[in-house]
């Protein structure tokens, strides 16, 4: 497997990506110290879609409320055995179709930048579950202690492409107990969820958070995320920030009990938006761009 190693030209920060394993970020180190949650590792991600590192959640992030959705009057069914479809413990489709997907093509690779492309139009198995021909280009740049991930969706043909994707960076503050980590968020709108993790339709305003993680757990959805919003986790003199720079108006915060990880997930639309609507499109001739960065 080809592993791409990116090095910050001005700092001892190194990132590694595996394009042929789903264009997943597998490592981010500062002076050799790992800052990404490895969980069960890359092998489990490839074998069973068990997320780790910085996986791509595409074409939808988080879960869908059922195995079908409608776009522009066209109803699409997700067959239980369809390529790439994985489900959560409640049987709901989870995190899109691209876990471990090998069809990414590396376009450019340098000491601190990687660009890879996925042609949805070239894969009938992907089109069966997401019938919107398009190109997805992901460019990763490492500079000034920041990993910047820029995604561009370009429609091919005359069908607009729903934008419901996201990323799932697993962050950790090494050598500091989880209970002592401090998390920070901007003002957000908290989406209330049901027992299956789906929005109920109710929401409440949430003021900015600055608090110790303690023994708390999160699996919470948000929208109205302002452009440029900063989420952070810190401890022991170390601070890791996730910047929602462009194109990510929704978020999920995930901090499971018993795991030394916290996730601030940039999302182009809230959970289950592909079924409920309210998302944006990449229209023909008008590529859509979304950018987030992780600063260490």
Whereabouts are the PLM-identified features?
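Short Pro-Gly-centered flexible turn/kink motifs
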Residues: 69-78, 151, 281-296
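Extended, loop-rich substrate-binding clefts of extracytoplasmic carbohydrate-active enzymes
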Residues: 82, 86-143
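Short, Gly/Pro- and small/polar-rich lid/capping loops
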Residues: 1-11
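Glycine-rich active-site loops that engage anionic ligands at enzyme catalytic sites
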Residues: 233-266, 271
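Active-site/ligand-binding surface loops and adjacent short beta/alpha elements
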Residues: 160-162, 169-245
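A short, structured loop/turn motif at beta-sheet edges
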Residues: 70-74, 106-114, 141-146, 175-180, ...
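Acidic-aromatic substrate-binding/catalytic surfaces of carbohydrate-active enzymes
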Residues: 14-82
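Acidic, contiguous internal or C-terminal segments within carbohydrate-active enzymes
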Residues: 6-8, 16-19, 28, 120-163, ...
